Amino acid sequence: MLTGQNGILNRASEAKEKTEIASKDEQRKLAQAEALMNTGKTTYKGLILPEGFAPTKIEGEDSIDDGLVITDGYGNEYVWVEVPRTSEVYPTATVNITEFNNDAYINIENDLHTYTSLYRNNTSYTDTYAEDDTSGWFKDESEYNEAKQKMLKSVYENEGFWVGRYEAGISELRGGAGEITAIPVSKENMYPYTYVTRTQAEVLAEKVESGSCTSSLMFGVQWDLVLKYIENKKEEKIPEISKRLNEDSEYIGNYWNSKIKLNRGKYVEYKAGILGNLWNDYTTDIKGCVENQQKVNTEGTGIFITTGASESTNLQNIYDMAGNVWEWTIENSEMNQEKCVYRGGAFDSYSRNRPVSFRYYLPNNHLYYSVGFRVAIY
């Protein structure tokens, strides 16, 4: 029998897949070793890499069109988000700014808002300072604006920025509020780093090693730029990609109504508004929840997954932007006492109501099991 489940062809296919995985693992280890030796900034394919990073050079991860991946010496991976410095993107700011004064920054920001207008959805939310007396937040408007202008200048000059390939992760599951001493990682098969407030997430993001570059939560415009980059690179292969990003993210994220396939990692069942406490290997079946590594679309039932557990959520080598956990940004909702903003929906969200472009506002003390974050480097 050649084509049966235990047939020669199936075994050959499985062997080939295992060989390819092993080969990629070896390439990752080599890239990590190279990263440890890169004590200064390096250049690769026209991009400036932070100190301590190297490209993985793995097929499918080695071009801006696919999503170029870099790693540090410990396996933390980031993806380049291209923002071309062209007259189409910067019609007002222009492409040859020599003096970065206040007017220049205003023009850059406004042009980027126009460039990403589909994903702003006429929002009134802005990247402006919101007062917060929580320890670790920007002390005043001047400090916030300085950080924003640093980001805008870097995006303009370098034509993009690095974003965490994965949601910020942690090796041991957080079961509630508590100390946040563990530095977040950007690796697959980690528990999403949840039960953190917006300010706690920013403090953690700033602690991530990024050489002489800056690590931070994303500003609102950066989140929109990630979506625009995905749209630009995917629109030929997925003509409806902008609708999936902006109207209904069912097929690109982990929502309760999604039917994602699990490829690795672990999951925990969410049913009737209750999150379970038993994390299962991705190959484990739970009737009406996950069967044959496929999430079953049962109303009111979902799964919370470890980082990068499903290729269904992979867009340009960036995992889980849509669904799984909400992700804090440092945008301002302008909503009285609820000025903190998170994006993208979660495993307990409905995809049409909470697509990846969706914004929502919360108070500065909000933390929850379905709220996490992602780190950007620029």
Report each predicted region and the residues it spans.
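GGW-centered surface loops in extracellular recognition modules
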Residues: 40-91, 215
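C-terminal juxtamembrane segment of a hydrophobic transmembrane alpha-helix
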Residues: 1-13
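Short, solvent-exposed loop/turn elements at domain surfaces
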Residues: 87-96, 170-176, 336-338, 350-353
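Short aromatic-cysteine micro-motif
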Residues: 74-75, 103-320
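Disulfide-stabilized, aromatic/cysteine-rich ligand-recognition loop
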Residues: 196, 203, 214, 307, ...
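Alpha-helix exit/C-cap motif
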Residues: 3-6, 22-41, 231-236
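Active-site-proximal beta-strands of protease catalytic cores
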Residues: 322-331
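Acidic glycine-/aspartate-rich tracts in secreted/extracellular proteins
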Residues: 84-88, 167-170, 330-336, 347-348, ...
